[in-house]
Amino acid sequence: MSNTDPQPPQKLPLNWVVWTLAVALMLYYLPAMRDRPEPAIKLPYSEFRMLLREGQISSVTLRGSELDGKFITPRMFPEQRRQYSRFLTQLPDFGNEAILAELEEQNIPLEVKEGHDASSSKVILLSYLPWIMFMIILFWLSRRTFRNFSGRGGAFDFDKRLETQFECQKPDTTFDEVAGQTNAKREVQELVEYLRDPDRFHRVGALAPRGVLLMGPPGTGKTLLARALAGEAGVNFYPMSASEFIEVFVGVGASRVRQLFKIAKENSPSIIFIDELDSVGRTRGAGYGGGHDEREQTLNQILAEMDGFAGHDAVIVLAATNRPDVLDPALMRPGRFDRHVTLDLPDQEGRVAILKVHARHIPLADDVNLNQVAAGTPGFSGADLKNLINEAAIQAARENRDHVHSLDFDIARDKIIMGAERTLIIPPDEKHRLAVHESGHTLVAYYLPNTDPLYKVSIVPHGRSLGGTHQLPLQERHTYPEEYLRDKLAVMLAGRIAERELLGSVSTGADDDIHQATGLARAMVSRWGMSKEVGPVDLRDSEEHPFLGREMAQPHHHSEFSAEIIDKAVRELLVAAETTAADLISTHREKLDRLVALLERSETLHKAQIDECLQTGAS
């Protein structure tokens, strides 16, 4: 005798019942739909008798008191604007014997079928069955949808969803992988010591910063530094993008914040990392949502949680942003994100270190000098340099080489700076105008004393542009003198001046040049005080990259009269830059002609070729 308990009979799942009924209903109705009779017109009894006497009826089917017949030939009925081959007629309760006799006399086939009244209950059931099935399926889908939302990680089951979403990580990243950011690593080093041994700090009453804000341009390694901090300290790491807090339902963001901080405290020492903090940390009360929208509720909950840390909670909140200027002031006060760590674009020494980190597993040829690569990539972030290494490796693989050569790095750098080369057939006259335009930029950049050295000029389409003149600074610039900016304006406008001088007209090719030059000139006047008429006054209209709420709430700091003065000063700067470019082009007209011819023939000129052409006149 078995000791196992008898198993209760399993219930047939509801979805199987629904699908079985649906299939059965479909099998029942498909033949009926396939054999659906053609449409029929209802005829009065008198008209039926007339057509019967005229011999226009071919066959008749009798169903109770209803007569279903067919015409010998289709008949046109103007009221319905169509022909009918079939008709229906309701017979009276008397005189049917005469009709039957007349049908028999004319040898018209007569078929008698069961009337509707005999099976009225069946007809009613079948007519309502599709609606019953529709309601059952709708009910099943509703239950299944709600179950998916509420029981399987849906929008109604926040707690279960968050427990899996905030999964603890143990990064193995170290500070050695964060190259080119020596100062930033030095600033967060004491946080590592605190997380490793918080009791040592508590004994003397010291508290570690509750919040550390990592600031810097995109691609400088803010997320990498946060992971390295957790890896060096050996603590739990809870990464979260700020945009993930926001949900379609009000209150979800605040709930997620509470859950995240609760889990981090229970598993301390730990680090909470919030990426792109400006998604929820922007200044409150500046947009359409007033003071009670979902984003602001989330921000308020973050502030409340950071205030609620106890002295023994070994939890540090790291956040990253590239827009610290738009953050709410309440986030920046002591006790919250009171320590700010800036990650700048790496200098040449830092770029060398970054290249060495990313090239560890790349087979480099003997002609590759990472110091030269770093010298030729000023302004590149860590992410840009990583991409440079990868693009060079892809280029080597494309050429079926086993090692990455210096030429691969040059091609990869050009692709990043200028965009990917694309095939485009340009008409000869347009190609000539393009060569004139780019040669104008090149000539003026070559002769002006305060511009960056030329790197390359090309009329081969790259990215979204048809051509380009590219310059690379010899070293990083942190400030820009006025003479440098004035010469930069002249270089920007030199292309259209060359078109006007050599071709007698200008084209739309200078659209972006004018846009960039106008923006630079306006900044010189309204932000940097480089106009005698305006003076050293900050009269900028808005942030460089404003978001909607901040822009709407920001007043203009000048009158219409001041705006006219600014516009006049901007125009004077641009006209002066055009004059400078025109003078140089007029003075070196012969060299410009030679440069145009050489560029049109070669399509791409490097610095050495440009120098040779403009210095010796070689063509």
Curated annotation (Swiss-Prot):
GO aspect biological process, one term: protein catabolic process
Keywords: ATP-binding, Cell inner membrane, Cell membrane, Hydrolase, Membrane, Metal-binding, Metalloprotease, Nucleotide-binding, Protease, Transmembrane, Transmembrane helix, Zinc
Annotated ATP binding sites: 216-223
Note accompanying the cofactor annotation: Binds 1 zinc ion per subunit.
Cofactor(s) required, per the database record: Zn(2+)
Membrane topology per record: Multi-pass membrane protein
Transmembrane segments: 12-32, 121-141
E.C. no: 3.4.24.-
Domain of life: Bacteria
Binding locations of Zn(2+): 437, 441, 513
InterPro entries: AAA+_ATPase, AAA_lid_3, ATPase_AAA_core, ATPase_AAA_CS, FtsH, P-loop_NTPase, Pept_M41_FtsH_extracell, Peptidase_M41
CDD domains named among the record's database cross-references: RecA-like_FtsH
Periplasmic side: 33-120
Residue intervals on the Cytoplasmic side: 1-11, 142-619
Pfam entry (one): Peptidase_M41
Subcellular location: Cell inner membrane
GO CC terms: plasma membrane
Residues the record marks as active site: 438
MF terms (GO), sorted A to Z: ATP binding; ATP hydrolysis activity; ATP-dependent peptidase activity; metalloendopeptidase activity; zinc ion binding
Keyword Magnesium among record annotations: no
Alphabetized PANTHER family for the sequence: ATP-DEPENDENT ZINC METALLOPROTEASE YME1L1, METALLOPROTEASE M41 FTSH
Quaternary assembly: Homohexamer.
Family, as annotated: In the central section; belongs to the AAA ATPase family. In the C-terminal section; belongs to the peptidase M41 family.
This protein's name: ATP-dependent zinc metalloprotease FtsH
Biological source species: Hahella chejuensis (strain KCTC 2396)
This protein's encoding gene: ftsH
